[in-house]
Amino acid sequence: MDTKRIATLALASLLWLGWFYTLSSTIATPPVTALRWIPPRSTAFMDRERGGAVSWDWVPYDRISQNLKRAVVEAEDGEFFEHQGVDVDAARRAALHNWRKRKFSRGASTITMQLARNLYLSPAKSPWRKVREVLIALKLERELSKDRILEIYLNVAEWGRGIYGAEAAARHYFRKDAKDLGARESAFLAAILPRPRFYDKHRSGPYLNRRISKIEGML
């Protein structure tokens, strides 16, 4: 990496961190301690369905296929068990990308950050939402174990219009329980997480099939 690129990356990182800490002191975050023991009653994403049918069945961590747990971590956040809610290197790369593009298009969201967004925020991309997302993610990491964070995430993630959580997804796509998902099925569910509503209607294609095979190969 040349000197100019390093300097640009460092400047982008400093600007992002300065902006983040300036805003963070003014932002309130929801209480999350109760999530240690009590599943959420709903999520911000479920609430936006506005009266539409929602399929959601909570299942405990030990009733979710190990294949799915591994597939989702590999696909969405390979450093999940190492970081404290924010992948600093990924965030730095995203900040540089956004600075170059002069728009907020990449967010480097970890599983914990995605959980914060699903529970309390909206899918709209904005710097303001990203700051709240990071702050809530840091709070979740302080209050909950990694297994609990992953358990909640797998139970509230969206897998299609009105399809929330691993159990509903397993039944919707494969007519089976989440605990019985195989490697290929788990890789499919992990692969469609970035665009679940689109892939619910388009369940095959060259890109998706390559992504499924890549994730399956990691298991």
Whereabouts are the PLM-identified features?
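Juxtamembrane regions of bacterial inner-membrane/periplasmic proteins
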Residues: 2-219
